[in-house]
Design a protein with these regions (language model features):
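P-loop NTP-binding core
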Residues: 1-266
Length: 266
């Protein structure tokens, strides 16, 4: 049975897409069948994993709006065990087109229900907004990861996101849980970053992942090569961070296999 995890934060620049790509790739490297769903009209997960959105013929847009079979849109990536359900620019207009569709909040759920048994994990890179596409993603998901950057105003806007999650829980998806709060862009040398870590841990307590994603050059440059950081440099801090996150999620969900190693310390 697949675990569907959405990564959501309407605030840009928090590492949402980076985390979606690299968490999905890390789960795949650990040999869990993983699908990365690009539900962001910017299609950065699509390009960041090696596909040109301009050449995509069938995407999540066609699945949601035109009811095409998602199997006809899914792409195999260069990473074993990792598939992609891509996005392209047409997704920008999807929210307007969905207004008059039947059960518009459940379109993504209907799509993923057709394929979820073929994967261990489905990772959804949500749109950086709280619009209908994000509502669809949260309605389809079992849980949500909230990326928070270790910078000034880190908690700004989280109230709106948490309220949206609560609305989805009350009206559309009562089983939706918060998988965890993920601290990103951490620089141990900066006092502010350490203050943010403490502030977030005080606010969210046990919901904060033990794994913290550090600032890392290899992590930043990997998307320009169209690969995950673990495919770009498996020994980099970024690759190790995301492998540790994947292991933490696997253990939390009781899915650990004997071959999954303990977390690597830096």
């Amino acid at each position: 049975m697949s675990k569907i995890i959405a990564l959501a934060n309407q605030k840009g620049g928090v590492g949402k897409t980076t985390s979606s790509i690299n968490l999905a790739a890390s789960l795949a490297v650990l040999e869990y069948r993983t699908l990365l769903v690009d539900a962001d009209p910017q299609a950065n997960s699509t390009s960041g994993i090696g596909f040109d959105p301009r050449t995509i013929k069938s995407s999540i847009y066609e699945c949601i709006i035109n009811d095409i079979d998602p199997k006809d849109a899914i792409k195999k990536t260069e990473t074993p065990f990792l598939d992609l359900l891509p996005a392209h620019i047409d997704l920008v207009g999807a929210e307007i087109e969905m207004i008059n569709l039947h059960e518009r909040e459940y379109r993504m759920k209907t799509v993923l229900n057709k394929i979820k048994d073929e994967y261990d994990f489905i990772i959804i890179d949500c749109s950086p907004s709280l619009g209908l596409i994000t509502i669809n993603s949260l309605t389809a998901a079992d849980s949500v990861i909230i990326p928070v950057q270790c910078e000034y105003f880190a908690l700004e806007g989280l109230g709106k996101l948490l309220n949206t999650i609560k609305i989805v829980q009350n009206r559309l998806n009562p089983e939706l849980a918060i998988e965890g709060v993920l601290l990103t862009m951490y620089d141990v040398r900066l006092r502010l970053a350490n203050q943010v870590v403490e502030e977030v841990k005080t606010h969210f307590q046990e919901l904060v992942f033990d794994t913290i994603i550090q600032r890392n050059t290899r992590l930043s440059e990997a998307p320009s090569f169209g690969v995950s950081v673990i495919m770009h440099d498996a020994n980099s801090k970024g690759a190790i961070n995301y492998l540790n996150l994947a292991r933490e999620i696997i253990r939390k969900n009781g899915l650990a296999q004997e071959e999954v190693e303990q977390a690597v310390t830096l």
